């Protein structure tokens, strides 16, 4: 999407990267050692990997993933989302799962045990940020800015591989089943949000029709 394209473009333009690092106070020697998507890393290099796809074969399947950014051993991902998804942390487990699979695919590059999620809020409101009060211990405060970053713990490589194997085993067991015998997808698999059912009463049923 546009967000990822813009982020990739900003990192793969070497002049922009050098200028930004210098503005951030990096020494000229450090800036010179920054290498974007290097095929090999020499001593003293500071490798940064942007939008790289990797795949791995397991149990007859190919697992593939393309991360946004890996820097200093940490995987980073950009998310354009609503403020309430952030407040309620409704995608927390998905982010952990996604980051864990990236690490499983790239254990040589992703060496840290956390994923950094960089949020860009599509519905942020300064008025909401001033009045919102934290309602529950497991929720985040309404973000003070239109962007925010949060760190999440990753699974171990063993946990990730076990999850992948279990999912592949389930898929394999369904391959020969007739359509009517297949299990229905869960709400999570269908991306159905909780408590989103809405019912409306219309005094005039014709008002529900569209031209």
Which positions does each model-derived feature cover?
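Short beta-strand-loop-alpha-helix junction that forms the active-site gateway
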Residues: 78-90
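Active-site catalytic microenvironments for nucleophilic, acid-base chemistry
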Residues: 9-13, 104-109
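Flexible, glycine- and charge-enriched loops at secondary-structure boundaries
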Residues: 88-95, 157
């Amino acid at each position: 999407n546009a967000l990822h394209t813009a982020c990739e473009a900003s990192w793969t333009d070497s002049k922009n990267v050098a200028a930004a690092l210098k503005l951030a106070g990096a020494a000229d020697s450090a800036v010179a050692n920054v290498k974007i998507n290097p095929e090999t890393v020499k001593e003293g290099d500071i490798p940064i990997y942007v939008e790289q796809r990797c795949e791995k074969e397991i149990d007859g399947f190919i697992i593939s993933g393309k991360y946004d950014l890996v820097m200093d051993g940490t995987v980073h991902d950009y998310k354009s989302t609503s403020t309430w998804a952030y407040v309620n942390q409704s995608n927390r487990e998905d982010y952990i799962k996604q980051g864990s699979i990236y690490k499983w695919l790239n254990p040589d590059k992703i060496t840290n045990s956390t994923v950094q999620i960089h949020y860009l809020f599509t519905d942020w409101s300064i008025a909401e940020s001033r009045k919102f009060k934290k309602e529950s211990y497991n929720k985040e405060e309404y973000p003070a800015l239109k962007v925010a970053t949060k760190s999440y713990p990753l699974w171990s490589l063993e946990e990730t591989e076990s999850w992948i194997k279990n999912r592949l085993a389930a898929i394999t067991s369904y391959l020969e089943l007739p359509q009517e015998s297949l299990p229905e997808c869960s709400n999570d698999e269908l991306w159905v949000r909780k408590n989103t059912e809405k019912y409306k009463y219309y005094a005039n049923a014709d008002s529900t029709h569209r031209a």
